[in-house]
Design a protein with these regions (language model features):
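A short acidic, Gly/Pro-enriched loop at the edge of an enzyme's catalytic core
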Residues: 95-107
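A short glycine-rich, Lys/Arg-flanked "PGG" loop and its adjoining helix->strand segment in the class I
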Residues: 120-132
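Short alpha-helix
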Residues: 149-164
Length: 194
């Protein structure tokens, strides 16, 4: 497996599993959050499969991803209510990109957090970008034990606590089959206190 997400960009939108994951995530999101008219940050947007779906119901979306190639593919979709930022999310990038200097009603992260070097620290930074009563929703591969690929329920719970979010949901949301293995996907939904 490559270390660079740029290497996956060209065929990403054609991958049936990636398409299915985005659709299942969107379906569960709209059951939990009324997205109509919301200002959204899609953190780790990739080529924007989830962003595209959100753009049909949300007001404005800022989509951020450190993969320049993936961000370029999303930009080429010319979604009128989407601003694309090709960068890592850091305090410095927030100061650098005017699109990130506002508060969001909803922040989503689809199959992102298990790849972060410091998930709790990143979630705390993301929480600072939410409006009071704003929603955080993430989907990540479920790890059965610490050290396995993905995130454990306990590590997600701990990150929600550290970031100050009130937990609304933390459960297996759906499963995906890869070869002979079924992999569960957690959904975590938190709300920033008023």
């Amino acid at each position: 497996m490559s270390d660079s997400w740029d290497d996956y960009a060209d065929g990403w939108d054609d991958n049936k599993d990636v398409q299915k994951y985005a659709q299942l995530a969107f379906n569960s999101l709209i059951q939990k959050v009324n997205c109509k008219g919301l200002n959204v940050l899609d953190f780790g947007c990739g080529t924007g499969l989830l962003t595209e779906k959100l753009s049909t119901v949300c007001n404005q979306i800022v989509a951020i991803d450190p993969s320049v190639k993936m961000a370029e593919i999303l930009s080429q979709k010319h979604l009128t209510n989407v601003k694309v930022v090709a960068d890592y999310l850091t305090p410095e990038s927030i100061q650098q990109h005017v699109e990130l200097q506002k508060s969001f009603d909803l922040i989503v992260a689809s199959s992102v957090c298990s790849f972060l070097p410091n998930y709790p620290k990143s979630l705390s930074l993301l929480t600072s970008l939410l409006v009071p009563n704003g929603h955080w929703v993430q989907w990540d591969w479920a790890a059965k034990n610490e050290g396995d690929f993905g995130l454990t329920k306990q590590s997600i719970e701990q990150a929600l606590i550290i970031s100050g979010l009130n937990k609304r949901a933390l459960d297996v949301d759906f499963s995906m089959k890869a070869k002979e293995e079924v992999m569960d996907v957690y959904i975590a939904h938190g709300i920033k206190p008023a």
